[in-house]
From Swiss-Prot:
It is found in: Cytoplasm, Cytoskeleton; Cell projection; Nucleus. ATP-binding component of the Arp2/3 complex, a multiprotein complex that mediates actin polymerization upon stimulation by nucleation-promoting factor (NPF). The Arp2/3 complex mediates the formation of branched actin networks in the cytoplasm, providing the force for cell motility. Seems to contact the pointed end of the daughter actin filament. In addition to its role in the cytoplasmic cytoskeleton, the Arp2/3 complex also promotes actin polymerization in the nucleus, thereby regulating gene transcription and repair of damaged DNA. The gene is actr2-b. It comes from the Eukaryota. PANTHER family: ACTIN. This is Actin-related protein 2-B.
Length: 394
């Protein structure tokens, strides 16, 4: 709470999950899937202890997903369906989750870098007009990650469910001209895994199976350090084969797909996306930075978001960066490579890094009124109030 007794809420609305809680806390109060479901057949049945309603949100929708038509209101970090997004916020602030009176609260929201201004304007409009928060602040996700890690300078590789971005931050300021965005993230890898499993003869085609495969991905997938070697293992042995039990009791066997799916992050052409993979994008970003800052950036690469949680990802990233540096900067001179210092930080709680940074920032700002956009300012200026965040509103 701030000095006037107003609660300060932090809400990290991801494409795949909502993480929400309060300023100063060191873990989100609630984490739930950002999905909205509607029953396929109209019925007033109960499944277990959950009643089927016309509109199901979050955890409940996830549990009963086989009976629902499931929608995600956000795609690639941008809100696509505002009505469903409002249902999601109603659920977040309502009795099921935070249970707050939004009129007496301030809220800190997050968004990916390079997001359309229209998206941010609409979010602020909904927060003030529908929920009537007393203050609103919108922070860039990558900067919050660094705050959570206690750094002011570094490069954040943030890969969530909807978008991956590489965002250099110098002395606490994100550098938009160097920020790169890659629209391959967790959701695309889940989709690719579904495709790979289909080739093996397992069909997952209902919107609800998507959640099932996502859970399987989180349990079994990893990033291969040396792809040729992994492929050899997959073809010639059964070391990689794991059994997985589906919710309906069927058991399926998953082998090479375990590393083939996340490989799309490093080789986008596998899922028909043009452009370079995450390692080369990171290398290009740092090399495009000012020559005096590059060494600092190589020493402070911070991973964040659920799609960086694959075992083997940090070491693969380091290997590819060294390889690229050797080829393109040192022109193949191996002796100089020992002087090249690189450090990839993979904090264990990186899945919720953005929320943690938001909780730190909101706690520092809670009584500094000049940081927040207030309801009064919004009533006077409308969406022009965003200029307070240092954003030019056209």
């Amino acid at each position: 709470m701030d000095s006037q007794g107003k609660k300060v809420v932090v809400c990290d609305n991801g494409t795949g999950f909502v993480k929400c809680g309060y300023a100063g806390s060191n873990f989100p109060e609630h984490i739930f899937p950002a999905l909205v479901g509607r029953p396929v057949i109209r019925s007033t049945a109960k499944v277990g202890n959950i009643e089927i309603k016309d509109l199901m949100v979050g955890d409940e929708a996830s549990e009963l997903r086989s009976m629902l038509e499931v929608n995600y209101p956000m795609e690639n970090g941008i809100v696509r369906n505002w009505d469903d997004m409002k249902h999601l916020w109603d659920y977040t602030f309502g009795p099921e989750k935070l249970n707050i009176d939004t009129r007496d609260c301030k809220i800190l929201l997050t968004e990916p870098p390079m997001n359309p201004t229209k998206n941010r304007e609409k979010i602020v409009e909904v927060m003030f007009e529908t929920y009537q928060f007393s203050g609103v602040y919108v922070a860039i996700q990558a900067v919050l990650t660094l705050y959570a890690q206690g750094l002011l300078t570094g490069v954040v590789v943030d890969s969530g469910d909807g978008v991956t971005h590489i965002c250099p931050v110098y002395e606490g300021f994100s550098l938009p001209h160097l920020t790169r965005r890659l629209d391959i993230a967790g959701r695309d890898i889940t989709r690719y895994l579904i495709k790979l499993l289909l080739l093996r003869g397992y069909a997952f085609n209902h919107s609800a199976d998507f959640e099932t495969v996502r859970m399987m991905k989180e349990k079994l997938c990893y990033v291969g350090y040396n792809i040729e070697q992994e492929q050899k293992l997959a073809l010639e042995t059964t070391v990689l084969v794991e059994s997985y039990t589906l919710p309906d009791g069927r058991v399926i066997k998953v082998g090479g797909e375990r590393f083939e799916a996340p490989e799309a992050l490093f080789q986008p052409h596998l899922i028909n996306v043009e452009g370079v993979g995450v390692a080369e994008l990171l290398f290009n970003t740092i090399q495009a930075a000012d020559i005096d800052t590059r060494a600092e950036f190589y020493k402070h690469i911070v991973l964040s978001g659920g799609s960086t949680m694959y075992p083997g990802l940090p070491s693969r990233l380091e290997r590819e960066l060294k390889q690229l540096y050797l080829e393109r900067v040192l022109k193949g001179d191996v002796e100089k490579l020992s002087k090249f210092k690189i450090r990839i930080e993979d904090p264990p709680r990186r899945k919720h890094m953005v929320f943690l940074g938001g909780a730190v920032l909101a706690d520092i700002m809670k009584d500094k009124d000049n940081f927040w956009m207030t309801r009064q300012e919004y009533q006077e200026k409308g969406t022009r109030v965003l200029e307070k965040l240092g954003v030019t509103v056209r």
